[in-house]
Amino acid sequence: MPLLGLLPRRAWASLLSQLLRPPCASCTGAVRCQSQVAEAVLTSQLKAHQEKPNFIIKTPKGTRDLSPQHMVVREKILDLVISCFKRHGAKGMDTPAFELKETLTEKYGEDSGLMYDLKDQGGELLSLRYDLTVPFARYLAMNKVKKMKRYHVGKVWRRESPTIVQGRYREFCQCDFDIAGQFDPMIPDAECLKIMCEILSGLQLGDFLIKVNDRRIVDGMFAVCGVPESKFRAICSSIDKLDKMAWKDVRHEMVVKKGLAPEVADRIGDYVQCHGGVSLVEQMFQDPRLSQNKQALEGLGDLKLLFEYLTLFGIADKISFDLSLARGLDYYTGVIYEAVLLQTPTQAGEEPLNVGSVAAGGRYDGLVGMFDPKGHKVPCVGLSIGVERIFYIVEQRMKTKGEKVRTTETQVFVATPQKNFLQERLKLIAELWDSGIKAEMLYKNNPKLLTQLHYCESTGIPLVVIIGEQELKEGVIKIRSVASREEVAIKRENFVAEIQKRLSES
């Protein structure tokens, strides 16, 4: 039977006859009633919309705009960080801002609840990336890469309570450096700590300390203290809060909320208060409980070797073996570390800024294998720089000192004291641009000279080239120093070379 659309011919004929039939009185009344109801609803909605208070324009909670002033400071920080990564031979890369939700789940322990999920898109469940490490591991497994040294700068998203006054956001930038591949023990790990020291020293944020531990030592400590293996990750997450909470509060969480026996928590407390240098590593080798745990001994052996390399790098004095460091993320398997500022540069009488850790990282040898169909592992170690917190510290320091920054890099301004000289200015600025010189001009046919000079002073442009009737007649260009207000006349054909000379000397 032939079809019209999806209905047989007879069905279409029946439907059309009903639609074309004149309406009865009851139907007409019902239609009129429905029309009145719809009109009333629409009127109510419009009225409610009109009575609605003015819309408040703002950024979403936990996010912020970056002004040109902020971007100048941020770019300087990122340039320093990236140049350090490149100095150590890293290659740049990027991954999508969102991943399949399955890629990210079960990688972050209790923090998995902080991921931002996206609405279903064509049958795929997606989440915004929580960090840059898991996407990197997925990339290695997907492309069967066995060895790589990479850096990655990008935004990540976490649905946590933001503390913007301390540089904590829901959307923030991370700068990661990672070494993937099978190498001799602790050599890549030592380089990561060296990079961390170079960056924090270069940023001149003040004195800092890098805490180190090993997840095998943490797990061994839990085992000898009597923590059930099923509670290892949950208790690890509690220990990770010791940088923000007092021991009594962490103990309360472990005992009351996570069901740990009080005597077990007390045994853990004896360990997590220990911190020191390589001598503490030696001391833990002799510990009557830890020395009986194979995992802990492996971790202590690697830390001893690590301190040997750190001494050769000249940074051992910046490193502290700290048994309270746990790093709550599930994917860490070996050495872990975290950098904290001991004091930030502040004026006398001011409280030091407390922003928590400014860099962290560790070894994650099993993460790539989670994505490989055959479970092939690619050992990895890396670090992440907390750009937002560092930026907050630098920003506060500049505010305290009253420092200002230039928002442009313009070197030369093209000006005129007379009307109808737009074409000449366009010729001059084109020559400057073509010579690689950063130049600007006002987008007006007849700008006032005073306005042009004031613009240079307010934006920090060092040089002005001036073209007018007299200069055009004599075949010269005036070059003016904004700082000294001195002017010299240079032949038209030599003015670019003269500017390049002055810029190279400044």
Swiss-Prot record:
Residues bearing PTM N6-acetyllysine: 444
GO biological process: one example: histidyl-tRNA aminoacylation
Summary of the tissues where the protein is detected: A high level expression is seen in the heart, kidney and skeletal muscle while a lower level expression is seen in the brain and liver.
Transit peptide stretch: 1-33
Record's catalysed reaction(s): tRNA(His) + L-histidine + ATP = L-histidyl-tRNA(His) + AMP + diphosphate + H(+)
Alphabetical keyword list: Acetylation, Aminoacyl-tRNA synthetase, ATP-binding, Deafness, Disease variant, Ligase, Mitochondrion, Nucleotide-binding, Phosphoprotein, Protein biosynthesis, Transit peptide
Binding positions (L-histidine): 131-133, 158, 174, 178, 327, 331-332
First-listed, main subcellular location of the protein, grouped into a coarse class: mitochondrion
Disease: Perrault syndrome 2: An autosomal recessive, sex-influenced disorder characterized by sensorineural deafness in both males and females and ovarian dysgenesis in females. Affected females have primary amenorrhea, streak gonads, and infertility, whereas affected males show normal pubertal development and are fertile.
PANTHER family named in the record: HISTIDINE--TRNA LIGASE, MITOCHONDRIAL, HISTIDYL-TRNA SYNTHETASE
Record's subunit section: Homodimer.
Protein name: Histidine--tRNA ligase, mitochondrial
Gene name of the record: HARS2
